[in-house]
From Swiss-Prot:
Keywords: Ribonucleoprotein, Ribosomal protein, RNA-binding, rRNA-binding, tRNA-binding. Belongs to the universal ribosomal protein uL5 family. It holds the Pfam family Ribosomal_L5. One of its GO terms (cellular component) is ribonucleoprotein complex. GO terms for molecular function: rRNA binding; structural constituent of ribosome; tRNA binding. It comes from Neorickettsia sennetsu (strain ATCC VR-367 / Miyayama) (Ehrlichia sennetsu). It comes from the Bacteria. Gene3D superfamilies: 3.30.1440.10. Coiled coil: none annotated. This is Large ribosomal subunit protein uL5.
Length: 177
């Protein structure tokens, strides 16, 4: 739904607000990266399996397990131990996820008042965290091993944060200020 809206009305609004004459020059979504960090995943294999399964349900494609790059003795972490999982969404799955995020997950999120400019990284990308992954309708609360948080990064082709904010607000991302 959001992808067809992108190609119809939102692209025209973005072009008008940014001030470009060609759709190729207009900023657009590139990818959405979802990641889950699990500190105790090396000692609890059921937690890792549950996180991979839940993230795969949310994203619509299989999540990849991330491993530690180096050993850190104070964290009882060895090189190669699993520490989380991640998935990168592009094209159709990206727009499906954004649609579910905006219209199903964020309205159910506790104390969510909108995004701010602090969510941007200075290069036109927006990152934020969700404290509970069970706000997505695909995840069954009864089958979840433990409630986990997740990081979401929306990568755009915009060169500045202002252009990215225009793009995201044209698609319905709520902003506070």
């Amino acid at each position: 739904m959001l992808e067809s809206e992108y190609h119809k009305s939102a692209l025209a609004r973005v072009m008008k607000e940014v001030g470009v004459d060609s759709p190729v020059k207009a900023p657009r979504f590139e990818k959405v990266c979802l990641s889950v960090g699990l500190g105790g995943a090396s000692s609890d294999s059921k937690l890792l399996a549950s996180a991979v399964e839940d993230l795969s349900l949310i994203a619509g494609q299989k999540a990849v397990v991330t491993v530690a790059k180096k050993s850190i003795s104070s964290f009882k972490l060895r090189k190669g131990f699993p520490v989380g999982c991640r998935v990168t969404l592009r094209k159709r799955r990206m727009f499906d996820f954004i649609n579910r995020l905006l219209y199903m997950a964020l309205p159910d999120q506790k104390d969510f008042k909108g995004f701010t400019m602090r969510n941007f990284d200075g290069h036109g990308n927006m990152a934020f965290g969700l404290t509970e992954h069970i706000v997505f309708p695909e995840v069954d609360f009864d089958k979840t091993y433990r409630i986990i948080g997740m990081n979401v990064v929306v990568v755009t082709t915009a060169s500045t944060d202002q252009l990215a904010r225009i793009l995201l607000s044209c698609y319905g991302f709520p902003f506070r200020d």
